[in-house]
């Protein structure tokens, strides 16, 4: 081995001598000048296969050093010869030989490795608008199509330009900010196949193209000595290389500051520099600057610190502190004041009396550093006796301050005395402010006004000052001897505000003057005016009383906001929000026939175009006011609209579809129910009713006392039965009266659309009644879950539509309750007494439980096929007494025993023992057929707005008022 190595050394020396002699491998140099070393083999590039030997020889007369560079790696060898016995792909790179003179020569070696075509440095950073190198040099220079490709086949940005270099990599030209986080591969074609390198993620360092954005937490600070001064400067830029610092104006002192920073996305950097002086002193006052700069430029912002030894209050009147105002006019006393620390107490005082209202105090600016405030005292219709000193007092934790306004009320003169004759002198005393002037006038006979002055008759005037800020009193006297004839004397007092006169009549009898009397010309006219005015007031009061006694329209549905103790707190419907998404153009409504009308409004059938679809027509019901409606009714209709929008949609309530509140009277658009109200539907179907149970009920007795005997049967005969007269209008029909008709379809065959058959043509059976009971209970459970009390649940307020779907509604203004015998006058309201719970009748209590009572009455209506409850019994004292004593109606003819049991529980005297609507739903579910339940479930699931799960009363109440429980006593509500 040593022999071979020696032979190789000898050969190298020989070659070196030959090269020196011939000088063919190096450029000619001048004698004495050093020359660069030479490398063997004498090529610029050398290609070897992986596993082969790399042998490089550097020849130079003196000392040489080898350097190998690839990517960021550098290796050195101080031998003349560089030998790598088994070449690897990582040995690809530039080999440089340097002599002692610093002259060098290089050769680039490619180690061809088909399994590793790229030498990859995956760190890839680029500065915006500069070139950046993707370092993926090749190990085989003979591959083709050396380029860049996007990851996962994504195309490269259209404006991306690059230059490939097999020895260095691929240079991306003029990097853009949009290239940030761009995923790349280096790519070549080898033997017809595309080969990709490992992926690169390009991270772009943005270039500064604007100065930093700098802001401070406050522009100025005012502190007392010893308080902490803390100010935060926020610097925003595209990268964290922005520089920032706090500086004090005219000072080189290093300030203590803390930094917090974070990135908001890729090119949004934010830094907060907080400057703190733990205990500020007066000499710390000054201007502090937050300075920031980047390569583009600099920006700064300042904040001012003022430190005072203690707090202060400075008051500045906005008007003159001496104020003159005429009697009956208004005046505003306004001050501005600076207060530091913040004011704690402010008040206006007059005559040792503190104003509790009529004034307001507010900061002049919403700026956090504001110390200036405004206080205004509003004096309205000042009287002559209300002049005086009005004082504003303000204080904070350090000082007190006050300012006073002297208010003088200018008053028209008032003549106090004008009929006194003292020692032959006629006196006239007047008071007013400013001081009045008195003139005398005379005219013969009895006149309304005198114009001839008595001057130059001797007139004596005596001024006397009144109380401070009060009226000034002036007394004037005239010698009555100046008057030689019968006549009228006028005393006229005037000042800048106005004038007042008094008249005197006198006459001569012989040589003596008769006692002077006041002028009485206008007394009859004045008395007549007072009488007429009094009569007008009485008429207005009577009309107002009658108007207030007139039953007013109000929304029956009440939404409970919370329960406090024994009181329901209702949401004021006028305060509910109204979303204008419900607005519908008026010109897309075409009105038809009137469906119902009352004293205040009506419901009209209409066609709405484009309500659901842009090109579709839909039949709707529109509730509107009559032209005679008052403001109260207009507000009530708007409240009803807000309540409906608050409740949302449910299959068993009449849902809101839209509204028109702009550009005309309010219109409420709701679903149209083609079969009208359930009460009349039941009465129409009596003769076609198919009963699926025994019809042998006795009809002799309709009432019994359920208070003491809960389980009495129809056959019981006790003193608790009442002898009742037949109903005036409708009574329970007997079996003999009925004419049965054959049903042409079953419930399960119906569809919600009228395409197959009209539901009104079908007969009515017990399954229908159970379905109606179930649906109304579901609807009431939904209202209860929304904390809504109905207050007028009855068959007349249930509508029926396709598929015999029931919908709960409130006719409200569209019902003529004045002519409806179901509504009885009680106080100044008409109430559906026979449907009301005892607590509602006697205590004006409306609760969720009182709705349950009404539901029991509704069930009686339903299973009696539309008969009036308590038939033949008028609402009088006897009725009220029997309700109190526990008398309840017997089961209607067509009610199953289970349904009558539900009615009895709904009529429990103790409201808290009545079932909730959720429990009622569960009870009825056990009785309806599977087909009916299945159909209802399908309809509910197909509804565009499925209702939320219904909650129980106790859960609902606890969710509304935290202090309530399911066992709470009756809750009193005064709003009937």
UniProtKB/Swiss-Prot annotation:
Residue ranges that the UniProt entry lists as topological domain Cytoplasmic: 546-976
Outcome after substituting residue 746 to A: Abolishes down-regulation of kinase activity by PKC/PRKCA-mediated phosphorylation
Gene Ontology molecular function, alphabetical: ATP binding; cytokine binding; growth factor binding; metal ion binding; protease binding; protein homodimerization activity; protein tyrosine kinase activity; SH2 domain binding
EC class name: transferase
Catalytic activity: L-tyrosyl-[protein] + ATP = O-phospho-L-tyrosyl-[protein] + ADP + H(+)
Up-regulation conditions: Up-regulated by cis-retinoic acid in neuroblastoma cell lines.
Consequence of substituting residue 623 to M: Stronger interaction with MPDZ
Location of Phosphoserine modifications: 741, 746, 821, 891, 959
Reported effect, residue 381 to A: Reduces autophosphorylation in response to KITLG/SCF
Miscellaneous comment: Numerous proteins are phosphorylated in response to KIT signaling, but it is not evident to determine which are directly phosphorylated by KIT under in vivo conditions.
Variant or mutagenesis effect after changing residue 816 to I: In MASTC; somatic mutation; constitutively activated; requires 2 nucleotide substitutions
Effect of residue 816 to H: In a testicular tumor; seminoma; somatic mutation; constitutively activated
Functional note: Tyrosine-protein kinase that acts as a cell-surface receptor for the cytokine KITLG/SCF and plays an essential role in the regulation of cell survival and proliferation, hematopoiesis, stem cell maintenance, gametogenesis, mast cell development, migration and function, and in melanogenesis. In response to KITLG/SCF binding, KIT can activate several signaling pathways. Phosphorylates PIK3R1, PLCG1, SH2B2/APS and CBL. Activates the AKT1 signaling pathway by phosphorylation of PIK3R1, the regulatory subunit of phosphatidylinositol 3-kinase.
Residues with site note (Important for interaction with phosphotyrosine-binding proteins): 936
InterPro entries: Ig-like_dom, Ig-like_dom_sf, Ig-like_fold, Ig_sub, Ig_sub2, Immunoglobulin_dom, Kinase-like_dom_sf, Prot_kinase_dom
Domain Ig-like C2-type: 27-112, 121-205, 212-308, 317-410, 413-507
Effect of residue 804 to W: In a colorectal adenocarcinoma sample; somatic mutation
Post-translational modification Phosphotyrosine, affected residues: 547, 553, 568, 570, 703, 721, 730, 823, 900, 936
Post-translational modification: Ubiquitinated by SOCS6. KIT is rapidly ubiquitinated after autophosphorylation induced by KITLG/SCF binding, leading to internalization and degradation.
Gene encoding the protein: KIT
Active site: 792 (proton acceptor)
This protein's name: Mast/stem cell growth factor receptor Kit
């Amino acid at each position: 081995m040593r022999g071979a190595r020696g032979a190789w050394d000898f050969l190298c020396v020989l070659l070196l001598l030959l090269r020196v002699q011939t000088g063919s491998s190096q450029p000619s140099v001048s004698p004495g000048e050093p020359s660069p070393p030479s490398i063997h083999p004498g090529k610029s590039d050398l290609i070897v296969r992986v596993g082969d030997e790399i042998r490089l020889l550097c020849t130079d007369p003196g000392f040489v050093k080898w350097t190998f560079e690839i990517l960021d790696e550098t290796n050195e060898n101080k031998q003349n010869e560089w030998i790598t016995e088994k070449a690897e792909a990582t040995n690809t790179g530039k080999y440089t030989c340097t002599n002692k003179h610093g002259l060098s020569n290089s050769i680039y070696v490619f180690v061809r490795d088909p399994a590793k075509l790229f030498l990859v440095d995956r760190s890839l950073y680029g500065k915006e608008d500069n070139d950046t190198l993707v370092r993926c040099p090749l190990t085989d220079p003979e591959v083709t199509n050396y380029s860049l490709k996007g990851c996962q086949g994504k195309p490269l940005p259209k404006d991306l330009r690059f230059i490939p270099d097999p020895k260095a990599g691929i240079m991306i030209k003029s990097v853009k900010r949009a290239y940030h986080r761009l995923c790349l591969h280096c790519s070549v074609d080898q033997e017809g196949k595309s080969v990709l390198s490992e992926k690169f993620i390009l991270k772009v360092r943005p270039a500064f193209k604007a100065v930093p954005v700098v802001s401070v937490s406050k522009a100025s600070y005012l502190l007392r000595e010893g308080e902490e001064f803390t100010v935060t400067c926020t610097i925003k830029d595209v990268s964290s290389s922005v520089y920032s610092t706090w500086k004090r104006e005219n000072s080189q002192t290093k300030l203590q500051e803390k930094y917090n920073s974070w990135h908001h996305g890729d090119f949004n950097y934010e830094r907060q520099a907080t400057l703190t002086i733990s205990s500020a002193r007066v000499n710390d006052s000054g201007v502090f600057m937050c300075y920031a700069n980047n390569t583009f430029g600099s920006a700064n912002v300042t904040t001012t610190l003022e430190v005072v030894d203690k707090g202060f209050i400075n008051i500045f009147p906005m008007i003159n502190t001496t104020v003159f105002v005429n009697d009956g006019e208004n005046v505003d006393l306004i001050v501005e004041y600076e207060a530091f620390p913040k004011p704690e107490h402010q008040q206006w005082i007059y005559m040792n009396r503190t104003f509790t209202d009529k004034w307001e105090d507010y900061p002049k600016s919403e700026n956090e550093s504001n110390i200036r405030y405004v206080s205004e005292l509003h004096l309205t219709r000042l009287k002559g006796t209300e002049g005086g000193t009005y004082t504003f007092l303000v204080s904070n934790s350090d000082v007190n301050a006050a300012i006073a306004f002297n208010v003088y009320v200018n008053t028209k003169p008032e003549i106090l005395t004008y009929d006194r004759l003292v020692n032959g002198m006629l006196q006239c005393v007047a008071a007013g402010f400013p001081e009045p002037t008195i003139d005398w006038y005379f005219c013969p006979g009895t006149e309304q006004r005198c114009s001839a002055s008595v001057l130059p008759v001797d007139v004596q005037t005596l001024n006397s000052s009144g109380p401070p800020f009060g009226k000034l009193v002036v007394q004037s006297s005239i010698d009555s001897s100046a008057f030689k004839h019968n006549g009228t004397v006028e005393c006229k007092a005037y000042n800048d505000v106005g004038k007042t006169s008094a008249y005197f009549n006198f006459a001569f009898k012989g040589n003596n003057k008769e006692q002077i009397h006041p002028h009485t010309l206008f007394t009859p006219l004045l008395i007549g005016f007072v009488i007429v005015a009094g009569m007008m007031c009485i008429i207005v009061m009577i009309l107002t009383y009658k108007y207030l006694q007139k039953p007013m329209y109000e929304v029956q549905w009440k939404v409970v906001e919370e329960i406090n103790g024994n009181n329901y707190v209702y949401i004021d419907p006028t305060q509910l929000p109204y979303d204008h998404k419900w607005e519908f153009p008026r010109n897309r409504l075409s009105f038809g026939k009137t469906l119902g009308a009352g004293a205040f409004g009506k419901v009209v059938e209409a066609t709405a175009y484009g309500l659901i679809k842009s090109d579709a027509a839909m039949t709707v019901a529109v509730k509107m006011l009559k032209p005679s409606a008052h403001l109260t009714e207009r507000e009530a209709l708007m409240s009803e609209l807000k309540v409906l929008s608050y409740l949302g949609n449910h299959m068993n309530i009449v849902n809101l579809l839209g509204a028109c509140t702009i550009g005309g009277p309010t219109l409420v658009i709701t679903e149209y129910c083609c079969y009208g109200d359930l009460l009349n539907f039941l009465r129409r179907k009596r003769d076609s009713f198919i009963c699926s149970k025994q019809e042998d009920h006795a009809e002799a007795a309709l009432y019994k006392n359920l208070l003491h005997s809960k389980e009495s049967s129809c056959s019981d005969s006790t003193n608790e039965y009442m002898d009742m007269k037949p109903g005036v209008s409708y009574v329970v029909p007997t079996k003999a009266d009925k004419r049965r008709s054959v049903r042409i379809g079953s419930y399960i065959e119906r569809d919600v659309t009228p395409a197959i058959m009209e539901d009104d043509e079908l007969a009515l059976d017990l399954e229908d009644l159970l379905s109606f009971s179930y649906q109304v209970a579901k609807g009431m459970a939904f209202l209860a879950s929304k904390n809504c009390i109905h207050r007028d649940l009855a068959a007349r307020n249930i509508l029926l539509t396709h598929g015999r779907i029931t919908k709960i509604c409130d006719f409200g203004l569209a019902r003529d309750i004045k002519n409806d015998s179901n509504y009885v006058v009680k106080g100044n309201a008409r109430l559906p007494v026979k449907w009301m719970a005892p607590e509602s009748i006697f205590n004006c209590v409306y609760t969720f439980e009182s709705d349950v009572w009404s539901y029991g009455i509704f069930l009686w209506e339903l299973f009696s096929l539309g008969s009036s409850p308590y038939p033949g019994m008028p609402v009088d004292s006897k009725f009220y007494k029997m309700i109190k004593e526990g008398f309840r109606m017997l089961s209607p003819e067509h009610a199953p025993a289970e349904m009558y049991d539900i009615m009895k529980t709904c009529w429990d005297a103790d409201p808290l023992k009545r079932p909730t609507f959720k429990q009622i739903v569960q009870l009825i579910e056990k009785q309806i057929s599977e087909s009916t339940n299945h159909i209802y479930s399908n309809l509910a699931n197909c509804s565009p707005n499925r209702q939320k799960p219904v909650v129980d009363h106790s859960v609902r109440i606890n969710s509304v008022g935290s202090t309530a429980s399911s066992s709470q006593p009756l809750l009193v509500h005064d709003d009937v």
